[in-house]
């Protein structure tokens, strides 16, 4: 079976709930882009969408969110570019090696104010471990054979991750609440 993700394939290492953050680095051999995260990630998950950066040979990325105020480019920011300026999540990647360092939402969106990051780009240990798998069926759109999907979902379950074809129920509830508040169906403050 192909690799789901290096941090998932052989079991998941638990993170440290008191972890204070660290630095992410692109894969360039020199003049690496450095991004400092002043805190741990939340909602860390395996993502099968076609937009997220994935390690070579992996079917899924592992991505979490952190307040955009806790994210700062601390070295070689001149090497960053936005992969797709029309996307809701503006993924900032290294122009040279292609690694995505952070994704920022600048349009009106339920997750505006949160940046999407790949904690695996950090040498520090203690980041929140993956909590679930999202957009699992999306790997079919990238050429994965549909007949093998049950095995993928079972592999996630074996390591303790619930596979979803959207986001987790908690995140879907947040999106629905945001939408209801914007439309006036729910009060702005609950």
UniProtKB/Swiss-Prot annotation:
One of its GO terms (molecular function) is S-(hydroxymethyl)glutathione synthase activity. It catalyses: S-(hydroxymethyl)glutathione = glutathione + formaldehyde. Keywords: Lyase, Metal-binding, Zinc. Pathway: One-carbon metabolism; formaldehyde degradation; formate from formaldehyde (glutathione route): step 1/3. Catalyzes the condensation of formaldehyde and glutathione to S-hydroxymethylglutathione. Zn(2+) 2 binds at residues 47, 49, 52. The keyword Zinc applies. Zn(2+) 1 binds at residues 26, 28, 94, 97. It comes from the Eukaryota. It comes from Pyrenophora teres f. teres (strain 0-1) (Barley net blotch fungus). Its cofactor is Zn(2+). This is Putative glutathione-dependent formaldehyde-activating enzyme. Residues 19-165 form the CENP-V/GFA domain. One of its GO terms (biological process) is formaldehyde catabolic process. Belongs to the Gfa family. Its EC number is 4.4.1.22. Pfam families: GFA. Binds 2 Zn(2+) ions per subunit.
């Amino acid at each position: 079976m192909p690799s789901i993700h290096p941090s998932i394939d052989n079991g998941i290492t638990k993170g440290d709930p008191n972890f204070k953050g660290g630095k992410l680095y692109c894969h360039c051999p020199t003049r690496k882009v450095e991004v400092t995260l002043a805190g741990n990630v939340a909602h860390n998950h395996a993502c099968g969408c076609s937009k997220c950066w994935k390690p070579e040979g992996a079917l899924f990325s592992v991505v979490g969110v952190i307040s955009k105020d806790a994210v700062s480019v601390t070295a070689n920011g001149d090497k960053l570019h936005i992969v797709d300026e029309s996307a809701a999540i503006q993924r900032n990647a290294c122009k040279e090696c292609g690694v995505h360092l952070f994704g920022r939402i600048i349009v009106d969106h339920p997750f505006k104010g949160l940046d999407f990051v790949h904690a695996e780009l950090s040498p520090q240990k203690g980041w929140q471990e993956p909590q679930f798998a999202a957009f699992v069926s999306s790997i079919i759109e990238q050429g994965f054979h549909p007949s093998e999907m049950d095995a993928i979902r079972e592999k996630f379950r074996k390591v303790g991750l619930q596979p979803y074809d959207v986001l987790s129920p908690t995140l879907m509830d947040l999106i629905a609440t945001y939408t209801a508040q914007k439309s006036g169906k729910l009060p702005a403050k609950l």
